[in-house]
Swiss-Prot record:
A motif (DEAD box) lies at residues 157-160. InterPro entries: DEAD/DEAH_box_helicase_dom (IPR011545), DEAD_box_RNA_helicase (IPR050079), Helicase_ATP-bd (IPR014001), Helicase_C-like (IPR001650), P-loop_NTPase (IPR027417), RNA-helicase_DEAD-box_CS (IPR000629), RNA_helicase_DEAD_Q_motif (IPR014014). This is Probable ATP-dependent RNA helicase Dbp45A. A motif (Q motif) lies at residues 7-35. It comes from Drosophila melanogaster. Residues 237-386 form the Helicase C-terminal domain.
Length: 521
């Protein structure tokens, strides 16, 4: 009689009920970070785990916490800190799914909802609290209706971002309210020295550390590509690349990243006005709107999501086939997080990043050095880009007018002021500082532009990349700024399958008086 092989999760020390639940979820084996970190956490060690995006980091800490919670089901057993609303809700969902058999209670504290409602949920004795630092600090300083006296686990997810200094004030308040005898678990896509040297959360001397060994920071199943554009036709290049991809992959899910909240909203409106259904996700949206947008995308009701970097970290949407960088991330690390939304858990995926030639070559060189991989050029029909130039420009202008009519800038200012007031800061003083920063930023952008116009590739990295075989044959004249006489492709050179609106017949112009007289004659 053939001996039945033990379940991989059972070997790690998890109870049969939890192993059975994981089997129901279709998980056949543990990922490397789960194999290494789960036994260490169950053994009572502090843990620092680093692995690529999509490697199963959430279950690496959620499973051992649920295992121990089933032995001692007390309230406020574990606290998970995370930097974004969306990630907080995703982590809570994974706790609920894995702990369904034991009836685990999870509370999300992330702002965007009524603080009194959150307070009531915290009073209902949840087992797990998943929180953003700022809102949890507000609860801890504003009321004493709950405590973390029973806390056994503190988890800091996306630790490289959480401990970089931006959240220190809130984290210090939280630390003072937590018991000293607990396990500290830190998880991130990258291992950083400052995690071990954190002055806010002390790390035990016997802390277990594990980092995924790889020279390549992105997964092998990810096909990474680039597109070159000029300053004036980035939107056209994006739309044509999206149109072509949709022709071949009609039911694929696509995430498009851009850098600012306003442009995220503007790009979303522009695509909608061109009959490309999409939802957007950015920080100025209400929490209900953000959750609804993400739910529609996750459930495949809408196949295109346009987002800022609030969606770049940690979000697990398994069915994303393509990530597009409409505007490039500011650092190679953020690039890794963005493209990590696709090709997750062994699946294949593609990323297409749009680089302005030659000004973005320095960033391309930095990204390729960081990921130890060369990007390949994505094919695009330049004649089609030329053809839709006018339509996209006009549609974007219409969208800008709609955005101005909706008082987007005024609502953004009100949002900032409300946030500063809640943080106990002087809104007028903070607004003055904000405007000064914006002016300095604009001045720096203009300075860089002057350098780039004076010399196409100002940095040594950019100069070296211009000598790369990929760019030697590039016609730089194509990327120079053109005026009113901008050339457009002729009808004979144009492909026959453009965007939907491009195929619509133009309305017949009404005849003027002169035309009517001619007809009568």
């Amino acid at each position: 009689m053939q001996r039945k092989e033990a379940n991989p999760f059972q070997i790690l020390g998890l109870r049969p009920w939890l192993v059975k639940q994981l089997t129901k979820l279709g998980l056949k084996g543990a990922t490397p970070i789960q194999q290494k970190c789960i036994p260490a956490i169950l053994a009572g060690q502090d843990c620092i785990g680093a692995a690529k995006t999509g490697s199963g980091k959430t279950f690496a800490f959620a499973l051992p916490i649920l295992e121990r919670l089933s032995e001692e089901p007390v309230s406020h057993f574990a606290l998970v800190l995370t930097p974004t609303h969306e990630l907080a809700y995703q982590i809570s969902e994974q706790f609920l799914v894995a702990g369904q058999a034991m009836g685990v209670r999870v509370c999300v504290v992330s702002g965007g909802t009524d603080q009194m409602v959150e307070s009531q949920k915290l009073m209902q004795r949840p087992h797990i609290v998943v929180a953003m630092p700022g809102r949890l600090a507000d609860h801890l300083t504003g009321c004493d209706t709950f405590s973390f006296d029973n806390l056994k686990y503190l988890v800091v997810d996306e630790a490289d971002r959480m401990l970089n200094g931006d959240f220190d004030e809130s984290l210090s308040i939280i630390e003072r309210c937590l018991p000293k005898t607990r396990q500290n678990l830190f998880f991130s896509a990258t291992m950083k020295d400052f995690i071990k040297e954190s002055s806010i959360f002390p790390i035990a001397s016997d802390c277990f550390e594990w980092s995924q060994d790889s020279d390549v920071a992105t997964v092998e199943t990810l096909d990474q590509r680039y597109l070159l554009c000029a300053d004036y036709d980035r939107d056209m290049v994006l739309i044509e690349a999206l149109r072509k991809y949709r022709e071949e992959n009609e039911n694929a899910n696509v995430m498009i990243f851009t850098n600012t909240k306003k442009y995220c909203q503007l790009l979303s409106m522009t695509l909608k006005n061109m009959e490309i259904d999409n939802v957007c996700l950015h920080g100025f949206m209400r929490q209900k709107e953000r959750v609804a947008a993400l739910s529609r995308f996750k459930s495949n009701q809408i196949r295109t999501l346009i987002a800022t970097d609030v969606a770049a970290r940690g979000l697990d949407i398994p069915s994303v086939e393509l990530v597009m960088n409409h505007m490039l991330p500011r650092t190679p690390k953020e690039y890794i997080h963005r493209v990590g939304r696709t090709a997750r858990a062994g699946r294949k995926g593609m990323s297409i990043s749009i680089f302005r030639f030659p000004r973005d070559l320095e960033l391309l060189a930095a990204i390729e050095e960081e990921i130890n991989t060369k990007l390949t050029e994505h094919p695009i029909d330049q004649r089609m880009v030329e053809r839709i130039f006018m339509q996209v420009n006009v549609t974007r202008r219409e969208s800008e007018m709609q955005l101005d009519n909706n008082d987007f800038d005024e609502r953004a200012q009100n949002y900032r002021r409300k946030t500063w007031i809640m943080e106990g800061k002087d809104p007028d003083q903070m607004e003055a500082l904000y405007r000064k920063k914006q002016k300095d930023k604009l001045r720096e952008i203009r300075r860089k532009r002057k350098l780039q116009h004076a010399e196409p590739a100002a940095s040594e990295e950019g100069k070296a990349l211009l000598q790369d075989e990929r760019f030697k044959s590039v016609d730089s004249a194509r990327f120079e700024k053109k005026g009113k006489g901008r050339s457009r492709a002729t009808q004979e050179d144009t492909p026959t399958k453009p965007l939907k609106r491009l195929n619509k017949e133009k309305p017949v112009a009404q005849k003027g008086r002169a035309d009517v007289k001619k007809d009568k004659a």
